[in-house]
Amino acid sequence: MVAVRVLAAMSGGVDSAVAAARAVAAGHDVTGVHLALARNPQTYRTGARGCCTLEDSRDARRAADVIGIPFYVWDMAERFQADVVDDFVAEYAAGRTPNPCLRCNEKIKFAAVLDRAVALGFDAVVTGHHARLGADGLLRRSVDLAKDQSYVLGVLTREQLGRSMFPLGDSTKTQVRAEATGRGLTVADKPDSHDICFVADGDTRGFLAERLGATPGDVVDSSTGAVVGRHTGAYAYTVGQRRGLHLDRPAPDGRPRYVLSITPKTNTVTVGPAEALAVSQVRAQRPVWTGGPRPADPIECEVQLRAHGDVVPATVAVTGDGLRAELHRPVRGVAAGQAIVAYRPDPGGDVVLGSATIAA
């Protein structure tokens, strides 16, 4: 591998620290950077859950010191607010369910950060994502399928992938932690973050309520058309949700009810039985295709419809600014705003073909 000048995005976690260390071991000229993203005061409390905390910044700096690389903090809060946080709120207000980690990769880590890195003379950005990027430029699943993050990287363009490095793709999380211990990194046993970084303590409903206010409306049963409850904000619900519906009466058939759809125009949440969640066709928009030339005809592949979701065989057609997937078996709980990522099965790791944002 040719040694290049790389910027290591260091979140303060074990993955990004080991990724930076591996880049140094590979002979690259590495500089570490921690992104200051969230300006929610609650994220700066000692012991606050999530990421973007003061502890994370300190952990990233300590890791850089142990590795022996220069370290800086870049303030990306304004860009992050506009492209990720405001987008998150607007999507929920529109009745969709966004994936902010995916949007952050698309707009911040591999756009704003990469653009600044290139302007400063860096050749690539290295991150601790669990995914593989081969010499052929194709993005593949990690060997550790339980930690695979290729889904949230599926939005990246060929140009962005061409300036990215993912050194952890051939390792399991257990191996990464063991290596961190061997390197003397204090984050070796630091727990993974599973929260949305800008939502303090994982309270998404409270976060949205502060910004969108109370907007009471009806909860309607799809089977009868009857109003079976009231809500204080349709933004608090997502397709497939069962808990927290607070219905006024049992369903006529006695079966559990799930959120089937959210209609912002009428401020209505529609609920129904589980089987009504099943869909066999998915429409999506703004496709990004990286696994070779964009197909002129429908192709057979596999698709993933949410992070850590099941993989489903499908026939996918890409036309203009749209993508259509005919699922070979019905899937429940497909939510607008999430990504559909297409994969080609491969013995060397399933290849990401492309992605798009689910519209319906």
Curated annotation (Swiss-Prot):
Annotated S-S bridges: 104-197
Residues that span the membrane, as ranges: none
Annotated active site: 104 (nucleophile), 197 (cysteine persulfide intermediate)
Highest taxon above the source species: Bacteria
Main subcellular location: cytoplasm
Function: Catalyzes the 2-thiolation of uridine at the wobble position (U34) of tRNA, leading to the formation of s(2)U34.
Protein name: tRNA-specific 2-thiouridylase MnmA
Underlying gene: mnmA
